[in-house]
Amino acid sequence: MGDEIVPPANQLAADNLENDGSTVQKAQFSDRVLIRSILGGGAKLAGQKVRIGGWVKTGRQQGKGTFAFLEVNDGSCPANLQVMVDSSLYDLSRLVATGTCVTVDGVLKIPPEGKGLKQSIELSVETVIAVGTVDPTTYPLPKTKLTPEFLRDVLHLRSRTNLISAVARIRNALAFATHSFFQEHSFLYIHTPIITTSDCEGAGEMFQVTTLINHTERVEQDLIDNPPPTEADVEAARLIVKERGEAVAQLKVAKASKEEITASVAQLSVAKASLAHVEERLRLKPGLPKNDGKIDYSNDFFGRQAFLTVSGQLQVETYACALSSVYTFGPTFRAENSHTSRHLAEFWMVEPEIAFADIHDDMNCAEAYVKYMCKWLMDKCGDDMELMDKNVDEGCTKRLNMVAKASFKRVTYTEAIERLEKAVAQGKVVFDNKVEWGIDLASEHERYLTEVEFDQKPIIVYNYPKGIKAFYMRLNDDEKTVAAMDVLVPKVGELIGGSQREERYDVIKQRIEEMGLPMEPYEWYLDLRRYGTVKHCGFGLGFERMIQFATGIDNIRDVIPFPRYPGKADL
C-alpha cells in the first residue's frame, strides 16, 4: 500500500467538476488551478495559461538532461498531471525527486501523438515559482512498495500515498453525504460533549479524564524539593500568631497611635498567612487523595469522575425529546485493550435520534441512510472508487451499487440463530464461536449471514435477547427480547446498531437496576421519562466501518487519519 498503486489517468467523474470543462477551476483561496479541473477539461483547455501547485509523484530527466517530466498531484483527485520543465528554467536534479513540492506557471498543451500518455493534456512550464526540495536518500516514502505497517509509523507523511489520499477523499465525501442526508430529512445537527459522566454502554471500558494525577505529581515533586514542615514548625508558627495578636491587643489598651496599631495588625496578618501556609503543607500527602479507602474526586477538575464519551446517544436523546429529529456526528472512545484489525480506541460515530418513531421507522431510516451514502460515493467519488476496485478490493464498486439499489432483508434474531444452527448441523460451516440462542452474534456469524445465507446482500437483524443489549432498549411484550436492530453488510458484518428506546419510566428504571448500574448518574436521563416521555428510536453507525465497507480495506487503522490503539497515539 503506497505509491505503487497507480491512479486512474483520465476517468474523472463529470460530477466532480463545477464547470463544463471548457475553463479551468481555480482554488477559491489560492491563485493555483486544481489539477482535477485540468484533467477533467482535457484537450479543450489547450492554450490556456495556468498556475498549478503539487507534489512530485515521479520525475525523470530526458534528452540528456535538457528537460524533465514530472507527475504532479495536488490532492484534488487521484490522477497526476504530467508537467514538462526545461533545464533552462531550473536545476532539474532538484525537481525530479519523489516528494518535491512545486509551484509552476505554464501553458496547457495537447501531448504529441505516440507518447503513450493516457491523459489528453499536459503542462509546459514557463516559470518555476517555488520549490520545496527533498533529499531522496532520507525521504521515508520512496517509490518502492510500502506496507501498511510501515506507513502507520509515518502518519505525518502517509497521506502523500495514493491509497491514503484516496481514503481521505472518500472519508470526506461520506461525511458530506451524512450531513446532506440528515439535513435533507429535517434533522438538526447537535454537538454532544466529548467529556461525560455517563456510560452509555455500561461496559466500563472508558478513558478517564482527571487532573488528579498532574496535581499528585506536582505535590510529590514539591515535597521532594521542599520537605514538609514538622509539628514543631506548626506550633512555632501558632506561637508567633499568638504573640502578634497579644501585641495588637496591648497597643489598643494603651491607646497607641493609629499608625502603630495598623503596623502591628499587618504583622499579625503576615503571621496568620504564614501559619495557614505551614498547616496546608503539613496536610500534603504523596499519592492520590482518598476518602474511606477510595479515590476522592471531590477536588478533581469536575468535582466528580469524568470520562471520554463512548457514545453521544444519551445526550442527543435530550434534544430528540424537544426537537424531534436530531443527530450527532463526532469522535467516541473505548479503552479496550484490543489489537485486532476491527478495533480502535478513538473512532467516529453517526448517531441520529427520532421522536415519535418506533423500531420499524428506525430500520427504514438506517436503510435509507446507507443507500444514500453508497449512491453518493458512486456519484461523487467514481475515480477514487475505481482506484480501490483495481488495487484493493475488486468488486467494491459493484458492492456499493448493489447496496444502493437493494432492499434490506429483515430477519428476527431468532430466525438468524436458526439459520446459523442449521448451517452448522448440515456441515456447511464451522464457527469458532458456538451458535445458540442468547449469544451476541460474532463477526463470523454476521458475515456468514450476509455473504452466504443472503447471497452478498445487506440484512437487518432485530429483536435481540435483552441480556446482551443495553438498558435503554425497549423491552418487547415477550419480556425476553428488546426492540434492537443491527444492519449487517458483506465484508464487515455489523455496520449499524440501533433500537427503539425504552420510554416507560418504571421499565427503564428496573433495567438499570437489573444491570447493576448506579442510579445517580442516570437521574437526568430518567427525567426524560418523568416529564413528557415520548416514543423514540435511534441508531449508531461506526464511520470507519462504513469506509471499510466502501473501500474493502481490511484494517480499520488505515481508514482514519490518525489511528489510536493500544500502544499507539502518534502525533
UniProtKB/Swiss-Prot annotation:
GO cellular component terms attached to this protein's record: cytosol
Reactions catalysed, as given in the entry: tRNA(Asn) + L-asparagine + ATP = L-asparaginyl-tRNA(Asn) + AMP + diphosphate + H(+)
Modified residues (N-acetylglycine): G2
Keyword Signal tagged: no
GO biological process, one term: asparaginyl-tRNA aminoacylation
Record's subcellular location: Cytoplasm, Cytosol
Enzyme class of the recorded protein, top EC level: ligase
Domain WHEP-TRS, chain residue ranges per copy: 233-289
One annotated GO molecular function: asparagine-tRNA ligase activity
InterPro entries, alphabetized: Aa-tRNA-synt_II, aa-tRNA-synth_II, aa-tRNA-synth_II/BPL/LPL, Asn-tRNA-ligase, Asp/Asn-tRNA-synth_IIb, NA-bd_OB-fold, NA-bd_OB_tRNA, WHEP-TRS_dom
DNA-binding region(s) from the entry: 50-128
Keyword annotations from UniProtKB, A to Z: Acetylation, Aminoacyl-tRNA synthetase, ATP-binding, Cytoplasm, DNA-binding, Ligase, Nucleotide-binding, Protein biosynthesis
Its EC number(s): 6.1.1.22
SS bonds (residue pairs): none
Keyword Aminoacyl-tRNA synthetase attached: yes
Source organism superkingdom: Eukaryota
Similarity section: Belongs to the class-II aminoacyl-tRNA synthetase family.
Protein name: Asparagine--tRNA ligase, cytoplasmic 3
Natural source organism: Arabidopsis thaliana (Mouse-ear cress)
